Design a protein with these regions (language model features):
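Short Gly/Ser/Thr- and Asp/Glu-enriched loop/turn motifs at secondary-structure junctions
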Residues: 67-69, 282-286, 319-320
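Non-catalytic, polymerase-adjacent accessory regions of viral genome-replication enzymes
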Residues: 1-53, 413-414
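Conserved polymerase palm-domain catalytic core
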Residues: 131, 136-285, 289-304
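Intrinsically disordered, low-complexity and often Lys/Arg-enriched segments
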Residues: 1-14, 180-197, 407-414
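Short, conserved non-catalytic motifs in the polymerase core
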Residues: 34-42, 67-93, 107-119, 218, ...
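Active-site-proximal segment of RNA-dependent polymerases
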Residues: 10-11, 97-159
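Right-hand nucleic-acid polymerase module
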Residues: 85, 94, 231-247, 270, ...
Length: 414
């Protein structure tokens, strides 16, 4: 168990069995949302009270161990290896998320876009546009955007370093005040005041222990391979957990991995903002952008960024994905091509859409409508009226959209 002697608090909160069980029921609902028809959820629900009570006792007794994960390959939007936790472990992940999400979020910069409520790709594109407008004096002055990418990010996260970063962050935040204006789930019987600290509403001894259990888990240990071995043909060895150094990699597919991807690179975000003093910067997972009027200044940051990532986090900057573009010619970021006063769907995103649309089964109207609706939703935030008409205004998809008049009225309107 991790030491927590430096948690300087006068009234630390201690998690009770009743509270943990209550929170596990809430975490179950989070994990099962939209999946109640899945066989593994139904099986767990058959003995829900018993299963959650057993899980509660394991967590309180510090005997909890994750079950082997399922490993398989997905091809969209690109080929990658996924490790999916068993359903009971996903409940634990959602419990951890409920306990720590708002704590970790307070440590992030405003321009971290992924896996944060109220942010995402659209928010990231809006912030990129905001930074460009500021740096270019509303598109009037010369300005450059430099995009950066990390090679095989999830496969090269050092779990020992991550554990150190996460635990130090939790310990530091335990002393911070929660804030009465924030909607924070509180334990039963706890009242929030202006002076309440996080350590008075969260059991940090429990959180530090659970952090270690989740971070240090080796996904390869006794994992269950799903699919044919040939599914792995053509997968870059740098993106396959069998070929990475022991102690590296987080399982793509787990909720906690999404949280930790931000926790790990928050160190880099702080370096860019505070040490490099880059005012105009944003990051979505491992894709980041730096904007500045001075092209030479941006180029001068590349070796500094490369050295910091390697020395502090053991990560390698993808040399082939460093791009500098004059912003008036357009900047591609998060599937969108941003130009002065307008945005377009990027060519790569459009190619993926067209490929997926070829696989849509038009005989299943409801499922097909969901697919079409998702793509139209993406396109609706860009200058794409003619593109939407060409893809969905005629032919088989037009007949499908005629089936839903509201969709036709909303998405095919100029």
């Amino acid at each position: 168990m991790l030491e927590n002697a430096d948690l300087l608090i006068s009234t630390p909160y201690k998690l009770t069995r009743a509270q943990l069980l209550y929170d596990l029921y809430a975490a179950f609902e989070d994990a099962a949302r939209g999946k109640h028809k899945m066989s593994y959820v139904k099986k767990f629900e058959e003995h829900l009270a018993e299963n959650l009570n057993v899980l509660c006792d394991e967590l309180l007794g510090r005997t909890y161990k994750a079950l082997p994960s399922k490993c398989f390959i997905v091809s969209y939007p690109k080929k990658r290896e996924v490790f999916a936790a068993m359903f009971r472990d996903r409940i634990v992940h959602h419990l951890y998320f409920r306990y720590t999400y708002q704590i970790f979020e307070r440590t992030f910069i405003a321009d971290t876009y992924s896996c944060i409520v109220g942010r995402g790709t659209l928010y990231g594109v809006e912030r990129l546009r905001h930074h460009i407008r500021q740096a270019s004096l509303n598109w009037q002055e010369e300005c450059y955007a430099m995009s950066l990418d990390i090679r095989g990010y999830f496969m090269h996260i050092d779990r020992e370093r991550l554990l150190k970063i996460a635990t130090e962050s939790l310990k530091k935040m335990s002393r911070h005040k929660v804030g009465v204006a924030d909607e924070v789930p509180l334990p039963s019987g706890v009242l929030l005041t202006e002076q309440t600290t996080w350590a008075e509403v969260r059991d940090f001894d429990f959180l530090l222990w659970l952090t270690e259990q989740i971070v240090m888990l080796d996904p390869m240990e006794n994992c269950i391979i799903v699919g044919d071995p040939s599914d792995w043909n053509g997968l870059d060895p740098a993106k396959c957990m069998r070929f990475v150094k022991k102690g590296l990699a987080l399982p793509i597919g787990n909720l906690t991995s999404q949280i930790y991807s931000n926790v790990y690179l928050n160190v880099f975000d702080q370096y860019v903002k505070r040490d490099l003093v880059c005012r105009h910067y944003g990051r979505y997972v491992d894709d980041s952008a730096m904007i500045d009027p001075d092209k030479d200044w941006l180029l001068a940051q590349v070796p500094k960024v490369r050295n910091f990532l390697w020395d502090e986090l053991g990560l390698e900057l993808h040399q082939g994905k460093i791009h500098i573009q004059e912003v008036h010619k357009g900047v591609e970021f998060l599937g969108t091509f941003v130009k002065p006063y307008r945005e377009y769907v990027s060519n790569r995103t459009l190619e993926r859409m067209q490929k997926k649309l070829q696989q849509v089964d038009l005989r299943n109207r409801e499922a097909a409508l969901r697919s079409v609706n998702s793509y139209l939703g993406i396109m609706s935030h860009t200058a794409s009226y003619n593109l939407r008409l060409s893809m969905f205004g005629e032919g088989e998809f037009a007949e499908l959209i005629e089936y839903d008049a509201d969709m036709k009225k909303g998405w095919l309107a100029a």
